[in-house]
Amino acid sequence: MRVSEPSDVVIRSDDTCHIHLTWSGSECDKYPAKQHARKVAMKLGVSSGLIYLVGQPTVNWGDSDQPQPFRQRRYFYYLSGIDEPDCYLTYDIQADLLTLYVPDFDLRRAVWMGPTLTIEEAHKQSDVDRVNFFAALQHDLEWWTTKNKGTRPIYVLHDSQQPLIPSKRLWLDNERLLPAMNAARVIKDEYELRMIRQANYISGLAHRKILEDIHRMSTEAEIESSFLATCVSHGAKNQSYAIIAGSGENAAVLHYVKNNEPLDGRQLVCLDAGAEWRCYASDVTRTIPLWTDWPSERARNIYRVVEEMQEECIRRIRKGVRFRDLQLLAHDIAIKGLQKLDILTNDCTSAIYESGASAVFFPHGLGHHVGLEVHDVSKRPITALDGNQANWGNHNFVPLLTDSSWSVPLLDEGMVVTIEPGIYFNRLALLNAQNQPLAKYINFDEAEKYIPIGGVRIEDDILVTAKGYENLTTAPKGEEMLEIIRRGIDNS
């Protein structure tokens, strides 16, 4: 039986494709989808097969005719650069052909909601080879599978995203694509770094605006709304994650997002907020005094300990460094700082660390990758804790590190990681710690005096470079932060 050829989708093996790209003007902002597709194929280590990805579909809320806010699937975006719903993508590895499928034109939808993405618009946004309407997808997939007679696999991320092809000879591989894409995404290219820099730039503006106006604010909600307003006014309508604006004891809740309490009588506010730019994240945390200066000596002292933790860890970032070593360094500095404040006993720092006592005050990891996700993917966890990673936050607060943890992934050029140490005085955590063996290392009477402070966290996004690092975060901190607060009061 003669097999009909597809509508403009896959180059036959006996054809030759010549692609010539001229970069000029706004074309420099085209998403490098083709480069990413080739990178994923290289990580797969194969010379043939078809990568098949499904974009985020339009989905309504349960029992409602109202759509949920759209958020593109990040793996799909990595190979397409298209931030529109109901799209599909194929990449023929042997033919080196990347094809995007956009929704068919729907007049009724166009009248009510505006037209969907056109073929011309898609080509302007991304350097995909071809763009077709969705109506061609099924035919093109069947053509490809029939031509290859089940001798080459179709790579999918999940079983739920496999193509609906009526073929008994279909070879699906749902195991290899995800780790290959994770390995590709962990190293950022120049386009991605521009997006992350812009996200950080807008976040920096929003953090600075809050410092200028903090003396006028009376609630956590005002801080959140100010941050959002600055981001939206600069074109960043989406946040990388829910804004955390925790004042007082709320600053000791790592992912506090209620942001609905008054600031009156509070010493500090922990503001963890980062804008998103073209699907790329920023992740920025600043701890802000609600006074013209530090409201108490205790608040100042804790800030200085966390500041030292961050500065020393950032200073050591370079290609080839084990991130886990920075995690250990941060704990070592935290332990010594808390010993000086008589919060921890003067026992050996290694004994205190191994007991888990320092994790009562610093219960989370030092950082993570940043990219299309705020907690971006990688081939292996950055601290190599793997399945034990959850133990940083277990009820005993004991960081269970096995011998295998020493086989740690190294930092490499092009990675973007956060450095976000923190020290917290969480009432529930301290109460729980009193019943643990680690209690002998903690002076609870002294620690409880710090509960009104809540906690201090400082977080920057750091690019690993060939010779060291570049701090991508522009939000003020330390003495610069205090100067802006003072000027805001003087100018009011």
From Swiss-Prot:
It comes from the Eukaryota. SUPFAM superfamilies: Creatinase/aminopeptidase, Creatinase/prolidase N-terminal domain. Binds 2 manganese ions per subunit. It catalyses: Release of any N-terminal amino acid, including proline, that is linked to proline, even from a dipeptide or tripeptide. One of its GO terms (molecular function) is metalloaminopeptidase activity. The keyword Hydrolase applies. Its EC number is 3.4.11.9. Mn(2+) 2 binds at residues 272, 283, 459. One of its GO terms (biological process) is proteolysis. Its cofactor is Mn(2+). Catalyzes the removal of a penultimate prolyl residue from the N-termini of peptides. Belongs to the peptidase M24B family. PANTHER family: XAA-PRO AMINOPEPTIDASE 3, XAA-PRO AMINOPEPTIDASE AN0832-RELATED. This is Probable Xaa-Pro aminopeptidase AO090005001240. It comes from Aspergillus oryzae (strain ATCC 42149 / RIB 40) (Yellow koji mold).
